[in-house]
Amino acid sequence: AKEGYLVNIYTGCKYSCWLLGENEYCIAECKEIGAGYGYCHGFGCWCEQFPENKPSYPYPEKSCGRK
C-alpha cells in the first residue's frame, strides 16, 4: 500500500483541512476510500495504507486551478 494526499478527482485539489494532526474529517475521508488511517498534514488530508487502485495528489488529469 502507498500513502499520499487524498485528491478530488473532479478538481485535482487536495482535500483541505485546518486542524493539523489528528483530524476526524481526514480519518473519515481516508477510510471512505479504503485507506487505513488519515490525518491533516500541510493543510491537506494525508492517508496511510492508501489502496493502490485509488488516485492520490497530484492527479495528472486535473491541475487544481494551476496551469
UniProtKB/Swiss-Prot annotation:
Which SMART domains does the record cross-reference, listed alphabetically? Knot1
PROSITE patterns under this entry? LCN_CSAB (PS51863)
Predominant cellular place of this UniProt entry's protein: secreted
What GO terms describe the biological role, i.e. biological process, of this protein? Answer: defense response
Q: Which residues form the signal peptide?
A: 1
Give each disulfide bond as a residue pair: 13-64, 17-40, 26-45, 30-47
Which UniProt keywords are present, listed alphabetically?
Answer: Amidation, Disulfide bond, Ion channel impairing toxin, Neurotoxin, Secreted, Signal, Toxin, Voltage-gated sodium channel impairing toxin
GO molecular function annotation: sodium channel inhibitor activity; toxin activity
PTM Cysteine amide: at which residues?
64
What InterPro entries has UniProt attached to this entry? LCN-type_CS_alpha_beta_dom, Scorpion_toxin-like, Scorpion_toxin-like_sf, Scorpion_toxinL, Scorpion_toxinL/defensin
What this chain does, per the entry, is described as:
Beta toxins bind voltage-independently at site-4 of sodium channels (Nav) and shift the voltage of activation toward more negative potentials thereby affecting sodium channel activation and promoting spontaneous and repetitive firing.
Domain comment as written in the entry: Has the structural arrangement of an alpha-helix connected to antiparallel beta-sheets by disulfide bonds (CS-alpha/beta).
What protein name applies here?
A: Toxin Cex8
Organism per entry: Centruroides exilicauda
